[in-house]
Structures are given as C-alpha cells and as structure tokens.
Amino acid sequence: MPKPEIHPTWYPDAKVICNGEVVMTTGSTQPEIHVDVWSGNHPFFTGTQKILDTEGRVDRFMRKYGMGGAGKAGEDKKAGDKADA
C-alpha cells in the first residue's frame, strides 16, 4: 500500500482535450490534458501528408556530382578548353 500524503492524486478518467474537444480519456495525475496535436488530426496519420520533394533525390545527386547528362556537358567544356590553349 502506498504511503499516504506523498503520492499525487490519480485520475483514472482524465480527459485529453484537443482544440476544445475531448478526444480520449486516459489515466493521469491531472484531470485534463490539453494537447495541440494528436493522431486524429496529424497529417501523417490522417493520410493528408504532402511531400514537398519536387525534385527527385537521385536526379539531384546526379546533377550535383556530374553524373549523367550534366557530366557529359562538363566533359565537352573541358575538351573545348584544351582546344583553345
């Protein structure tokens, strides 16, 4: 049995509130828990998540390190520099 007067009050039906609406109940040491985001309105869990990657990662890598189409243009430029010298 727990010692009296040292443990916080336990609320077995504490309300979890998001945007003024009770979304669930749980056990807690506070009677009400106010949250900004929960699984019912988070974009990841609702399926409304938008992917902002407009450029493919592989294409970006190829362009950055000169592989693929951008690399061939760079090689032509180097060959032209040698002809000018």
From Swiss-Prot:
Q: Where is the composition biased (Basic and acidic residues)?
A: 73-85
Briefly state the protein's biological role. Answer: Binds the 23S rRNA.
Where do the TM regions start and end? none
Q: Write down the SUPFAM superfamilies for this protein, in alphabetical order.
A: L28p-like
Q: Name one GO molecular function term.
A: structural constituent of ribosome
Q: How does it assemble?
A: Part of the 50S ribosomal subunit.
Keywords tagged on the record: Ribonucleoprotein, Ribosomal protein, RNA-binding, rRNA-binding
Q: Which gene encodes it?
A: rpmE
Q: Does the keyword RNA-binding apply?
A: yes
Q: Which NCBIfam families does the UniProt record give? A: L31 (TIGR00105), PRK00528.1 (NF001809)
The biological processes this protein is annotated with in GO are: translation
Alphabetical GO CC annotations of the entry are: ribonucleoprotein complex; ribosome
Which Gene3D superfamilies does the entry mention? Ribosomal protein L31 (4.10.830.30)
Q: What is this protein called?
A: Large ribosomal subunit protein bL31
Region spans: Disordered: 65-85
What family is this protein classified in? Belongs to the bacterial ribosomal protein bL31 family. Type A subfamily.
